[in-house]
Amino acid sequence: IKPVYVLDELFQAKLIIEAVIEDLKIKQELFCRLESVLEADSILSTNTSSLDLNKIGTNLKRPERFLGMHFFNPVPVMALVEIIHTAETDPSVTEFVFQLAKKWGKVPVHVRNSPGFIVNRAARPFYLEALRILTDGATDAATCDAIFRDCGGFRMGPFELMDLIGLDVNYEVTTQVWESFDRHPRFEPS
């Protein structure tokens, strides 16, 4: 791994893991630019938290070499990485990235491209109910976190985790999942 300061310097990279802002247009533009400078056998991956990979990769010339690698914060500590494939992702690309993640000491899981993937889809009600508990005045954020952490065995409570992730990112992910499920009330941002 080495830093570069101009995209053209990536021309020999075999694997790109993109981690820019959760903005579909920005990701689409970046991947098109990357594809234009990379060799044909390079693998493009996105660390998106919830954006539809089919939409991100819609303009790619080589969609079979595109997939998701969703890491969790803090990345050096958290072992899980979701390996997300689309209908167009070459299975050998998916398997290569899966095995590479294992070599890095991660615990990869195969995931089909779907709203929020596994963790962010399952986590939405966790965060949303915590926010509703706070809004309803049932308890304060610190007490809620302490209950989950000290009594429930969680490493962090819901508010601590939202703070680590960033409220802006958490809200955007919740909105994307909610929109993907036709604004189903169980995913409605609060």
Model-derived features with residue positions:
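N-terminal glycine-rich phosphate-binding loop for ADP-containing cofactors
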Residues: 1-190
